[in-house]
């Protein structure tokens, strides 16, 4: 299941997770990968991805396993959780399905630009969604599944994710923002 190409593509996703670990409210896009040096040591059992920020010199190490063979123990500069390549979509920020790694999604033109919302913006959105009339139901935002790659990338243990803001270029109006609420699926 795991091969050199999958791990190389996954390393770019892990680069984005690294950005969120150090800067939880960063706007994520594919250009962030250029801020990091990525060292990939591929192995059939356990692959190691070492990510170093080019200017800040912070280091983070990810251990990557197939779902059938996880023997995790923390190492120096470790992320804190094993990254598991799974055969199908599963819950958990550290479980990446193999079908997301068939192509280099981060380099794709279809890769979105997105971010987590800060507490002030969440308050504003919540107040806009509330109806003044008690008889009317409040407005609901469209949902994004917790299994989506953007939600897995934005995971941060200290900042629970309630909303994801997507940014889309529009030739007429400039940048559009699209907010989605995170749906917990079971």
Curated annotation (Swiss-Prot):
Q: Which family does it belong to?
A: Belongs to the poxviridae DNA-directed RNA polymerase 22 kDa subunit family.
Single biological process term from Gene Ontology? viral transcription
The organism encoding this protein is: Fowlpox virus (strain NVSL) (FPV)
Catalytic reaction(s) noted: RNA(n) + a ribonucleoside 5'-triphosphate = RNA(n+1) + diphosphate
Q: How does it assemble?
A: The DNA-dependent RNA polymerase used for intermediate and late genes expression consists of eight subunits Rpo30/OPG66, Rpo7/OPG90, Rpo22/OPG103, Rpo147/OPG105, Rpo18/OPG119, Rpo19/OPG131, Rpo132/OPG151 and Rpo35/OPG156. The same holoenzyme, with the addition of the transcription-specificity factor OPG109, is used for early gene expression.
Record's keyword annotation contains Translocase = no
Give a GO molecular function annotation for the protein.
Answer: DNA-directed RNA polymerase activity
What task does this protein carry out?
Part of the DNA-dependent RNA polymerase which catalyzes the transcription of viral DNA into RNA using the four ribonucleoside triphosphates as substrates. Responsible for the transcription of early, intermediate and late genes. DNA-dependent RNA polymerase associates with the early transcription factor (ETF), itself composed of OPG118 and OPG133, thereby allowing the early genes transcription. Late transcription, and probably also intermediate transcription, require newly synthesized RNA polymerase.
Recorded protein name is DNA-directed RNA polymerase 22 kDa subunit
Indicate where this protein resides in the cell.
Virion
């Amino acid at each position: 299941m795991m091969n050199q190409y999958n791990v190389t593509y996954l390393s770019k996703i892990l680069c984005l997770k690294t950005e969120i670990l150090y800067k939880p409210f960063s706007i994520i896009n594919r250009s962030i990968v250029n801020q990091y040096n990525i060292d990939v040591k591929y192995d059939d059992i356990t692959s190691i991805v070492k990510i170093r920020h080019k200017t800040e010199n912070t280091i983070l190490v990810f251990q990557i396993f197939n779902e059938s063979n996880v023997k995790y123990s923390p190492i120096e500069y470790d992320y804190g959780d094993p990254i598991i390549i799974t055969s199908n979509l599963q819950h958990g920020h550290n479980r990446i399905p193999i079908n997301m790694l068939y192509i280099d999604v981060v380099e794709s033109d279809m890769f979105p630009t997105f971010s987590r919302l800060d507490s002030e913006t969440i308050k504003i959105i919540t107040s806009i969604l509330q109806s003044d009339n008690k008889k009317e139901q409040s407005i609901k935002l469209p949902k994004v599944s917790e299994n989506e790659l953007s939600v897995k990338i934005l995971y941060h243990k200290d900042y629970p994710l309630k909303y994801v803001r997507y940014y889309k270029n529009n030739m007429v109006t400039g940048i559009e923002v699209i907010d989605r609420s995170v749906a917990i699926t079971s």
